[in-house]
Amino acid sequence: MSDRNPLIDADRRADEDNTLRPQTLDDFVGQAAARANLKVFIEAAKVRGEALDHVLFVGPPGLGKTTLAQIMAKELGVNFRSTSGPVIAKAGDLAALLTNLEERDVLFIDEIHRLSPAVEEILYPAMEDFQLDLIIGEGPAARSVKIDLAKFTLVAATTRLGLLTTPLRDRFGIPVRLNFYTVEELEYIVRRGARIMQMGISSDGAREVARRSRGTPRIAGRLLRRVRDFALVAGADIIDRRIADEALSRLEVDNRGLDQLDRRYLNIIARNFGGGPVGIETIAAGLSEPRDAIEDIIEPYLIQQGFLQRTPRGRVLTAVAWQHLGLPAPAEIIQQSQYGLFMEDE
């Protein structure tokens, strides 16, 4: 009989995705400021012999939130337990997780913004006082029971900071925002991945994959694996720029890292709504994609690259987007661009 807890993803998957993950903070590429601060906080916690304060990672998907949480547990020399907000359906699920933690263990909750209010209420005293306040029974026979917990570290991740309630957000002593990676950082990650895969790659080949990876290591790893497949079938011993370009073009990833869905998004606003402003619900209906996916996956990179601007009236394409689509921009967009009203996010 298996004693595996379905709430905890304890599978040791030997796939390439995990093989490519860095194992220490020194191996982790990018997020220099965040890594430097985490090193200090981890070392201080070890010196004090106490649990690390609770950590909240904020940023788009694929930037390394889960990997950093695993590395933190390893550097602290403690156990790592992982789950996600949607999986914790009721208070009893969370209680089962928390009561099985040992002193200073790391519990990672991905998508913490998707916790139900009832579960979130249980989490407050657990984070602050390391106690569970449970109601046993119903009606007049109901009674409150307090259960002491081991002093643990909650590491949480969210792509939607605004959806976290203030009481929950304020209980994280170490908030960490993760940003998109530079092409240089991704190029290093791609070259490292190719070495692990035992596949040769040239500098310009690695750079071609890197600059089409949307500033995201997870996407860089995925694209590298697909480019490797094209190279192997073509009988190439090394991935050069030509092979990378041909493979990525066949995958419909353009020279700015935009895929078919990104271009559909831009084209809907450009062709159907004259460049905007247009509301997110209208765009979601046009794409047949959920609003959350658009706001979490598509829009952050488009905004960061200067293709899109959010305004109180809706989404508006910038002159950069019109140029990328090969369409003539409306006169007012050109004027606004000249006056610097559409600027790329820093």
UniProtKB/Swiss-Prot annotation:
<feature type="binding site">
    <location>
        <position position="181"/>
    </location>
    <ligand>
        <name>ATP</name>
    </ligand>
</feature>
<feature type="binding site">
    <location>
        <position position="315"/>
    </location>
    <ligand>
        <name>DNA</name>
    </ligand>
</feature>
<comment type="function">
    <text>The RuvA-RuvB-RuvC complex processes Holliday junction (HJ) DNA during genetic recombination and DNA repair, while the RuvA-RuvB complex plays an important role in the rescue of blocked DNA replication forks via replication fork reversal (RFR). RuvA specifically binds to HJ cruciform DNA, conferring on it an open structure. The RuvB hexamer acts as an ATP-dependent pump, pulling dsDNA into and through the RuvAB complex. RuvB forms 2 homohexamers on either side of HJ DNA bound by 1 or 2 RuvA tetramers; 4 subunits per hexamer contact DNA at a time.</text>
</comment>
<dbReference type="InterPro" id="IPR000641">
    <property type="entry name" value="CbxX/CfxQ"/>
</dbReference>
<dbReference type="InterPro" id="IPR041445">
    <property type="entry name" value="AAA_lid_4"/>
</dbReference>
<keyword id="KW-0067">ATP-binding</keyword>
<dbReference type="GO" id="GO:0005737">
    <property type="term" value="C:cytoplasm"/>
</dbReference>
<dbReference type="GO" id="GO:0009378">
    <property type="term" value="F:four-way junction helicase activity"/>
</dbReference>
<feature type="region of interest" description="Large ATPase domain (RuvB-L)">
    <location>
        <begin position="1"/>
        <end position="181"/>
    </location>
</feature>
<feature type="binding site">
    <location>
        <position position="66"/>
    </location>
    <ligand>
        <name>Mg(2+)</name>
    </ligand>
</feature>
<feature type="binding site">
    <location>
        <position position="218"/>
    </location>
    <ligand>
        <name>ATP</name>
    </ligand>
</feature>
<dbReference type="GO" id="GO:0016887">
    <property type="term" value="F:ATP hydrolysis activity"/>
</dbReference>
<dbReference type="Pfam" id="PF17864">
    <property type="entry name" value="AAA_lid_4"/>
</dbReference>
<dbReference type="GO" id="GO:0000400">
    <property type="term" value="F:four-way junction DNA binding"/>
</dbReference>
<feature type="binding site">
    <location>
        <position position="20"/>
    </location>
    <ligand>
        <name>ATP</name>
    </ligand>
</feature>
<dbReference type="GO" id="GO:0006310">
    <property type="term" value="P:DNA recombination"/>
</dbReference>
<dbReference type="GO" id="GO:0006281">
    <property type="term" value="P:DNA repair"/>
</dbReference>
<dbReference type="InterPro" id="IPR036388">
    <property type="entry name" value="WH-like_DNA-bd_sf"/>
</dbReference>
<keyword id="KW-0378">Hydrolase</keyword>
<keyword id="KW-0963">Cytoplasm</keyword>
<dbReference type="Pfam" id="PF05491">
    <property type="entry name" value="RuvB_C"/>
</dbReference>
<feature type="binding site">
    <location>
        <position position="62"/>
    </location>
    <ligand>
        <name>ATP</name>
    </ligand>
</feature>
<comment type="subunit">
    <text>Homohexamer. Forms an RuvA(8)-RuvB(12)-Holliday junction (HJ) complex. HJ DNA is sandwiched between 2 RuvA tetramers; dsDNA enters through RuvA and exits via RuvB. An RuvB hexamer assembles on each DNA strand where it exits the tetramer. Each RuvB hexamer is contacted by two RuvA subunits (via domain III) on 2 adjacent RuvB subunits; this complex drives branch migration. In the full resolvosome a probable DNA-RuvA(4)-RuvB(12)-RuvC(2) complex forms which resolves the HJ.</text>
</comment>
<keyword id="KW-0227">DNA damage</keyword>
<feature type="binding site">
    <location>
        <position position="21"/>
    </location>
    <ligand>
        <name>ATP</name>
    </ligand>
</feature>
<keyword id="KW-0547">Nucleotide-binding</keyword>
<dbReference type="InterPro" id="IPR008824">
    <property type="entry name" value="RuvB-like_N"/>
</dbReference>
<dbReference type="InterPro" id="IPR008823">
    <property type="entry name" value="RuvB_C"/>
</dbReference>
<dbReference type="InterPro" id="IPR027417">
    <property type="entry name" value="P-loop_NTPase"/>
</dbReference>
<protein>
    <recommendedName>
        <fullName>Holliday junction branch migration complex subunit RuvB</fullName>
        <ecNumber>3.6.4.-</ecNumber>
    </recommendedName>
</protein>
<comment type="similarity">
    <text>Belongs to the RuvB family.</text>
</comment>
<dbReference type="InterPro" id="IPR003593">
    <property type="entry name" value="AAA+_ATPase"/>
</dbReference>
<dbReference type="InterPro" id="IPR004605">
    <property type="entry name" value="DNA_helicase_Holl-junc_RuvB"/>
</dbReference>
<feature type="binding site">
    <location>
        <position position="171"/>
    </location>
    <ligand>
        <name>ATP</name>
    </ligand>
</feature>
<feature type="binding site">
    <location>
        <position position="67"/>
    </location>
    <ligand>
        <name>ATP</name>
    </ligand>
</feature>
<feature type="binding site">
    <location>
        <begin position="128"/>
        <end position="130"/>
    </location>
    <ligand>
        <name>ATP</name>
    </ligand>
</feature>
<keyword id="KW-0238">DNA-binding</keyword>
<dbReference type="InterPro" id="IPR036390">
    <property type="entry name" value="WH_DNA-bd_sf"/>
</dbReference>
<feature type="region of interest" description="Head domain (RuvB-H)">
    <location>
        <begin position="255"/>
        <end position="346"/>
    </location>
</feature>
<feature type="region of interest" description="Small ATPAse domain (RuvB-S)">
    <location>
        <begin position="182"/>
        <end position="252"/>
    </location>
</feature>
<feature type="binding site">
    <location>
        <position position="291"/>
    </location>
    <ligand>
        <name>DNA</name>
    </ligand>
</feature>
<dbReference type="GO" id="GO:0005524">
    <property type="term" value="F:ATP binding"/>
</dbReference>
